[in-house]
Amino acid sequence: MTKTIIDQAGATPGAIRTREGLVSAYRTELAIAGAIVLLVLAVGTQVPQAMSWGNFANITQAGAPLIIMSLGVLLVVITGGIDLSVGSVFSLTGMVTAQAMASGLDVSAALIGLGVGLVFGSINGFLVTVAGLAPFVVTLITFAVAGSLAFIVTNGRSMPIGDPDFWLLNSGSLIPGVPNYILFCIVLLVVIEIFLKKMVAGRWFYAVGSSAAAARLLGIPVKRTQFFAYVASSLLASFSGLLTISYILNAESTAGSSLMLQAIAAVVIGGASLLGGTGTAVGAVLGALMITVIQNGVNLIGINSFWQGSVTGLAILIAVLIDRFSKSRRGAV
Protein backbone atom coordinates (compact mmCIF):
# COMPACT_ATOMS: atom_id res chain seq x y z
CA MET A 1 0.00 0.00 0.00
CA THR A 2 2.81 2.37 0.86
CA LYS A 3 4.46 1.87 -2.51
CA THR A 4 1.14 2.46 -4.32
CA ILE A 5 0.52 5.81 -2.64
CA ILE A 6 4.09 6.97 -3.14
CA ASP A 7 3.93 5.98 -6.82
CA GLN A 8 0.73 7.97 -7.25
CA ALA A 9 2.41 11.03 -5.79
CA GLY A 10 4.69 11.49 -8.81
CA ALA A 11 3.42 12.75 -12.14
CA THR A 12 5.23 10.05 -14.09
CA PRO A 13 6.51 7.37 -11.68
CA GLY A 14 8.43 4.32 -12.82
CA ALA A 15 5.45 1.97 -12.90
CA ILE A 16 3.50 4.28 -15.20
CA ARG A 17 6.51 4.76 -17.45
CA THR A 18 6.87 1.01 -17.82
CA ARG A 19 3.20 0.67 -18.70
CA GLU A 20 2.68 3.63 -20.98
CA GLY A 21 6.12 3.94 -22.48
CA LEU A 22 8.82 6.54 -22.50
CA VAL A 23 7.09 8.89 -24.95
CA SER A 24 3.89 8.97 -22.91
CA ALA A 25 5.80 9.46 -19.67
CA TYR A 26 7.68 12.45 -21.03
CA ARG A 27 4.98 13.94 -23.26
CA THR A 28 5.15 17.31 -21.49
CA GLU A 29 8.92 17.44 -21.85
CA LEU A 30 8.69 16.46 -25.52
CA ALA A 31 6.20 19.26 -26.11
CA ILE A 32 8.60 21.74 -24.50
CA ALA A 33 11.48 20.45 -26.60
CA GLY A 34 9.33 20.88 -29.70
CA ALA A 35 8.48 24.43 -28.66
CA ILE A 36 12.18 25.21 -28.22
CA VAL A 37 12.92 23.95 -31.74
CA LEU A 38 10.08 26.07 -33.14
CA LEU A 39 11.39 29.13 -31.29
CA VAL A 40 14.88 28.62 -32.70
CA LEU A 41 13.49 28.17 -36.22
CA ALA A 42 11.27 31.24 -35.87
CA VAL A 43 14.18 33.41 -34.76
CA GLY A 44 16.35 31.83 -37.46
CA THR A 45 14.00 33.05 -40.18
CA GLN A 46 14.66 36.60 -39.00
CA VAL A 47 18.30 36.25 -37.98
CA PRO A 48 20.21 33.42 -39.74
CA GLN A 49 22.93 33.74 -37.11
CA ALA A 50 20.53 32.10 -34.64
CA MET A 51 21.03 28.77 -36.43
CA SER A 52 24.82 28.81 -36.15
CA TRP A 53 26.81 26.47 -33.92
CA GLY A 54 28.39 29.51 -32.35
CA ASN A 55 24.99 30.75 -31.20
CA PHE A 56 24.05 27.32 -29.87
CA ALA A 57 27.28 27.40 -27.86
CA ASN A 58 26.30 30.82 -26.53
CA ILE A 59 22.89 29.50 -25.49
CA THR A 60 24.33 26.56 -23.56
CA GLN A 61 27.02 28.75 -21.98
CA ALA A 62 24.48 31.37 -20.89
CA GLY A 63 21.91 28.79 -19.82
CA ALA A 64 24.14 26.56 -17.69
CA PRO A 65 23.86 28.60 -14.44
CA LEU A 66 20.08 28.83 -14.80
CA ILE A 67 19.82 25.10 -15.53
CA ILE A 68 21.75 24.21 -12.39
CA MET A 69 19.81 26.64 -10.21
CA SER A 70 16.50 25.39 -11.63
CA LEU A 71 17.34 21.80 -10.70
CA GLY A 72 17.72 22.90 -7.09
CA VAL A 73 14.52 24.92 -7.08
CA LEU A 74 12.73 21.91 -8.59
CA LEU A 75 13.49 19.79 -5.53
CA VAL A 76 11.87 22.36 -3.24
CA VAL A 77 8.85 22.87 -5.50
CA ILE A 78 8.19 19.13 -5.73
CA THR A 79 7.93 18.99 -1.93
CA GLY A 80 5.33 21.76 -2.02
CA GLY A 81 7.69 24.56 -0.99
CA ILE A 82 9.24 27.58 -2.64
CA ASP A 83 12.73 29.06 -2.51
CA LEU A 84 12.94 32.79 -3.16
CA SER A 85 16.48 33.09 -1.81
CA VAL A 86 18.40 31.40 -4.63
CA GLY A 87 19.19 34.59 -6.55
CA SER A 88 20.64 36.30 -3.48
CA VAL A 89 22.56 33.17 -2.49
CA PHE A 90 23.96 33.10 -6.04
CA SER A 91 25.17 36.70 -5.68
CA LEU A 92 26.54 36.31 -2.15
CA THR A 93 28.45 33.19 -3.16
CA GLY A 94 30.23 35.10 -5.89
CA MET A 95 31.08 38.04 -3.65
CA VAL A 96 32.34 35.89 -0.77
CA THR A 97 34.44 33.73 -3.10
CA ALA A 98 35.94 36.76 -4.83
CA GLN A 99 36.72 38.40 -1.49
CA ALA A 100 38.34 35.21 -0.20
CA MET A 101 40.55 35.00 -3.28
CA ALA A 102 41.45 38.67 -2.95
CA SER A 103 42.56 37.88 0.61
CA GLY A 104 45.09 35.36 -0.66
CA LEU A 105 43.23 32.07 -1.06
CA ASP A 106 43.54 30.09 -4.29
CA VAL A 107 40.73 28.33 -6.14
CA SER A 108 39.95 26.48 -2.90
CA ALA A 109 37.98 29.64 -2.05
CA ALA A 110 35.21 27.95 -4.03
CA LEU A 111 34.63 25.72 -1.00
CA ILE A 112 33.88 28.81 1.06
CA GLY A 113 31.43 29.84 -1.64
CA LEU A 114 29.67 26.49 -1.40
CA GLY A 115 29.59 27.02 2.35
CA VAL A 116 27.34 30.02 1.74
CA GLY A 117 24.81 27.73 0.10
CA LEU A 118 25.09 25.16 2.87
CA VAL A 119 24.49 27.78 5.57
CA PHE A 120 21.51 29.45 3.92
CA GLY A 121 20.01 26.14 2.84
CA SER A 122 20.26 24.87 6.41
CA ILE A 123 18.67 28.06 7.75
CA ASN A 124 15.81 27.76 5.28
CA GLY A 125 15.33 24.09 6.06
CA PHE A 126 15.44 24.63 9.82
CA LEU A 127 12.96 27.50 9.84
CA VAL A 128 10.54 25.62 7.58
CA THR A 129 10.73 22.17 9.17
CA VAL A 130 11.51 22.89 12.83
CA ALA A 131 10.19 26.39 13.43
CA GLY A 132 7.19 25.66 11.21
CA LEU A 133 7.31 28.95 9.31
CA ALA A 134 5.85 29.29 5.83
CA PRO A 135 8.40 28.65 3.05
CA PHE A 136 7.45 31.89 1.31
CA VAL A 137 8.13 33.95 4.44
CA VAL A 138 11.35 32.12 5.33
CA THR A 139 12.95 32.34 1.90
CA LEU A 140 11.80 35.94 1.45
CA ILE A 141 13.71 36.76 4.64
CA THR A 142 16.85 34.92 3.56
CA PHE A 143 16.51 36.49 0.12
CA ALA A 144 16.72 39.91 1.77
CA VAL A 145 19.51 38.94 4.18
CA ALA A 146 21.73 37.28 1.56
CA GLY A 147 21.13 40.13 -0.87
CA SER A 148 22.11 42.67 1.78
CA LEU A 149 25.24 40.74 2.71
CA ALA A 150 26.26 40.58 -0.95
CA PHE A 151 26.44 44.38 -0.90
CA ILE A 152 28.10 44.59 2.51
CA VAL A 153 30.99 42.26 1.62
CA THR A 154 32.51 44.80 -0.78
CA ASN A 155 30.35 47.88 -0.17
CA GLY A 156 28.53 47.20 -3.41
CA ARG A 157 31.65 47.18 -5.58
CA SER A 158 32.26 44.48 -8.16
CA MET A 159 35.19 42.18 -7.40
CA PRO A 160 37.57 40.83 -10.06
CA ILE A 161 38.80 37.25 -9.77
CA GLY A 162 42.56 37.42 -9.47
CA ASP A 163 43.37 33.78 -10.24
CA PRO A 164 42.93 33.09 -13.98
CA ASP A 165 43.01 29.34 -13.30
CA PHE A 166 39.55 29.72 -11.75
CA TRP A 167 38.26 30.05 -15.32
CA LEU A 168 38.90 26.33 -15.75
CA LEU A 169 36.00 25.49 -13.39
CA ASN A 170 33.56 26.66 -16.04
CA SER A 171 35.32 26.35 -19.38
CA GLY A 172 37.95 23.71 -18.74
CA SER A 173 37.43 20.13 -19.91
CA LEU A 174 37.53 17.24 -17.47
CA ILE A 175 36.47 15.18 -20.49
CA PRO A 176 38.34 16.23 -23.66
CA GLY A 177 36.09 18.15 -26.00
CA VAL A 178 33.30 18.67 -23.46
CA PRO A 179 33.32 22.01 -21.59
CA ASN A 180 32.86 21.60 -17.85
CA TYR A 181 29.67 23.68 -17.75
CA ILE A 182 28.00 21.21 -20.12
CA LEU A 183 29.39 18.23 -18.23
CA PHE A 184 28.11 19.56 -14.90
CA CYS A 185 24.63 20.17 -16.33
CA ILE A 186 24.42 16.67 -17.80
CA VAL A 187 25.71 14.95 -14.66
CA LEU A 188 23.34 16.87 -12.37
CA LEU A 189 20.40 16.24 -14.72
CA VAL A 190 21.03 12.49 -14.80
CA VAL A 191 21.73 12.17 -11.07
CA ILE A 192 18.66 14.16 -9.99
CA GLU A 193 16.33 12.48 -12.49
CA ILE A 194 17.46 9.02 -11.38
CA PHE A 195 17.21 10.05 -7.72
CA LEU A 196 13.65 11.34 -8.12
CA LYS A 197 12.32 8.55 -10.28
CA LYS A 198 14.26 5.43 -9.32
CA MET A 199 15.18 5.80 -5.65
CA VAL A 200 12.87 5.46 -2.66
CA ALA A 201 14.16 8.67 -1.08
CA GLY A 202 13.39 10.48 -4.33
CA ARG A 203 9.82 9.19 -4.32
CA TRP A 204 9.46 10.70 -0.86
CA PHE A 205 9.71 14.16 -2.44
CA TYR A 206 6.60 13.52 -4.53
CA ALA A 207 4.73 12.00 -1.61
CA VAL A 208 5.52 14.95 0.65
CA GLY A 209 4.48 17.42 -2.03
CA SER A 210 1.23 15.59 -2.74
CA SER A 211 0.22 15.35 0.92
CA ALA A 212 2.62 15.87 3.80
CA ALA A 213 0.04 14.54 6.26
CA ALA A 214 -0.48 11.32 4.32
CA ALA A 215 3.26 10.90 3.83
CA ARG A 216 3.80 11.28 7.58
CA LEU A 217 1.23 8.56 8.29
CA LEU A 218 3.13 6.27 5.93
CA GLY A 219 6.30 6.74 7.94
CA ILE A 220 8.04 8.98 5.41
CA PRO A 221 10.47 11.42 7.08
CA VAL A 222 8.68 14.57 5.92
CA LYS A 223 10.83 17.12 7.74
CA ARG A 224 14.08 15.48 6.73
CA THR A 225 12.97 15.37 3.10
CA GLN A 226 12.00 19.05 3.13
CA PHE A 227 15.23 20.02 4.90
CA PHE A 228 17.32 18.20 2.30
CA ALA A 229 15.41 19.93 -0.51
CA TYR A 230 16.24 23.41 0.81
CA VAL A 231 19.89 22.56 1.41
CA ALA A 232 20.22 21.09 -2.09
CA SER A 233 18.52 24.14 -3.61
CA SER A 234 20.91 26.59 -1.95
CA LEU A 235 23.97 24.47 -2.69
CA LEU A 236 23.08 24.33 -6.38
CA ALA A 237 22.44 28.09 -6.36
CA SER A 238 25.94 28.56 -4.92
CA PHE A 239 27.46 26.21 -7.47
CA SER A 240 25.66 28.12 -10.20
CA GLY A 241 27.18 31.33 -8.86
CA LEU A 242 30.65 29.80 -8.86
CA LEU A 243 30.28 28.73 -12.50
CA THR A 244 29.25 32.24 -13.46
CA ILE A 245 32.11 34.11 -11.78
CA SER A 246 34.60 31.54 -13.04
CA TYR A 247 33.51 32.36 -16.58
CA ILE A 248 33.45 36.16 -16.40
CA LEU A 249 36.20 36.33 -13.72
CA ASN A 250 34.24 39.01 -11.91
CA ALA A 251 31.67 39.04 -9.11
CA GLU A 252 28.81 41.51 -8.74
CA SER A 253 26.43 41.97 -5.82
CA THR A 254 23.37 42.05 -8.09
CA ALA A 255 24.40 39.23 -10.45
CA GLY A 256 21.57 36.93 -9.38
CA SER A 257 18.82 39.52 -9.05
CA SER A 258 16.76 38.18 -11.96
CA LEU A 259 17.63 34.51 -11.67
CA MET A 260 15.18 33.63 -8.90
CA LEU A 261 12.17 34.44 -11.07
CA GLN A 262 13.74 32.72 -14.05
CA ALA A 263 14.49 29.55 -12.07
CA ILE A 264 10.93 29.32 -10.77
CA ALA A 265 9.65 30.02 -14.27
CA ALA A 266 11.85 27.26 -15.70
CA VAL A 267 10.51 24.75 -13.20
CA VAL A 268 6.88 25.68 -13.87
CA ILE A 269 7.34 25.79 -17.64
CA GLY A 270 8.97 22.37 -17.34
CA GLY A 271 5.77 20.87 -15.98
CA ALA A 272 6.14 21.14 -12.20
CA SER A 273 3.19 22.39 -10.16
CA LEU A 274 3.69 25.12 -7.57
CA LEU A 275 1.30 23.11 -5.41
CA GLY A 276 3.88 20.32 -5.23
CA GLY A 277 3.92 16.63 -6.07
CA THR A 278 4.93 16.85 -9.73
CA GLY A 279 7.93 17.75 -11.84
CA THR A 280 10.97 16.22 -13.50
CA ALA A 281 14.60 17.22 -13.82
CA VAL A 282 14.30 16.91 -17.60
CA GLY A 283 11.40 19.35 -17.58
CA ALA A 284 13.29 21.87 -15.42
CA VAL A 285 16.29 21.76 -17.75
CA LEU A 286 14.11 22.23 -20.82
CA GLY A 287 12.27 25.08 -19.11
CA ALA A 288 15.59 26.79 -18.41
CA LEU A 289 16.68 26.26 -22.01
CA MET A 290 13.42 27.74 -23.28
CA ILE A 291 13.93 30.89 -21.21
CA THR A 292 17.52 31.16 -22.44
CA VAL A 293 16.42 30.70 -26.06
CA ILE A 294 13.79 33.42 -25.62
CA GLN A 295 16.37 35.80 -24.16
CA ASN A 296 18.82 34.95 -26.92
CA GLY A 297 16.17 35.52 -29.57
CA VAL A 298 15.13 38.86 -28.07
CA ASN A 299 18.75 40.02 -28.21
CA LEU A 300 19.36 38.78 -31.76
CA ILE A 301 16.18 40.30 -33.16
CA GLY A 302 16.97 43.59 -31.45
CA ILE A 303 13.93 43.83 -29.18
CA ASN A 304 14.42 46.00 -26.10
CA SER A 305 15.92 43.75 -23.41
CA PHE A 306 13.54 45.21 -20.82
CA TRP A 307 10.81 43.11 -22.43
CA GLN A 308 12.52 39.91 -21.30
CA GLY A 309 10.89 40.07 -17.87
CA SER A 310 7.46 40.48 -19.43
CA VAL A 311 8.05 37.51 -21.71
CA THR A 312 9.19 35.39 -18.75
CA GLY A 313 6.13 36.38 -16.74
CA LEU A 314 3.85 35.55 -19.66
CA ALA A 315 5.53 32.16 -20.03
CA ILE A 316 4.87 31.43 -16.34
CA LEU A 317 1.22 32.44 -16.71
CA ILE A 318 0.73 30.19 -19.73
CA ALA A 319 2.44 27.25 -17.98
CA VAL A 320 0.30 27.68 -14.84
CA LEU A 321 -2.90 27.91 -16.88
CA ILE A 322 -1.97 24.77 -18.81
CA ASP A 323 -1.23 22.99 -15.53
CA ARG A 324 -4.56 24.10 -14.06
CA PHE A 325 -6.44 23.07 -17.22
CA SER A 326 -4.81 19.64 -17.36
CA LYS A 327 -5.59 19.01 -13.68
CA SER A 328 -9.23 20.02 -14.14
CA ARG A 329 -9.53 17.68 -17.12
CA ARG A 330 -8.06 14.78 -15.14
CA GLY A 331 -10.45 15.58 -12.29
CA ALA A 332 -13.41 15.59 -14.65
CA VAL A 333 -12.41 12.21 -16.04
UniProtKB/Swiss-Prot annotation:
Membrane topology category: Multi-pass membrane protein
Disulfide bonds: none
Ranges annotated as spanning the membrane: 30-50, 62-82, 84-104, 110-130, 133-153, 175-195, 228-248, 253-273, 274-294, 300-320
GO cellular component: plasma membrane
Family annotation (InterPro entries): ABC_transp_permease
Name of one Pfam family that matches: BPD_transp_2
GO MF: transmembrane transporter activity
Keyword terms, alphabetized: Cell inner membrane, Cell membrane, Membrane, Plasmid, Sugar transport, Transmembrane, Transmembrane helix, Transport
Record keyword Membrane present: yes
Source organism, top-level taxon: Bacteria
Subcellular location, principal: membrane
Subcellular location(s) per record: Cell inner membrane
The keyword Cell membrane belongs to this UniProt entry's keyword annotation: yes
PANTHER family hit by this protein: ABC TRANSPORTER PERMEASE PROTEIN YPHD-RELATED-RELATED (PTHR32196), RIBOSE IMPORT PERMEASE PROTEIN RBSC (PTHR32196:SF72)
Protein family membership: Belongs to the binding-protein-dependent transport system permease family. AraH/RbsC subfamily.
Task performed by this protein: Probably part of the binding-protein-dependent transport system y4mIJK. This system probably transports a sugar. Probably responsible for the translocation of the substrate across the membrane.
Name of protein: Probable ABC transporter permease protein y4mJ
Lineage per the UniProt record: Bacteria, Pseudomonadati, Pseudomonadota, Alphaproteobacteria, Hyphomicrobiales
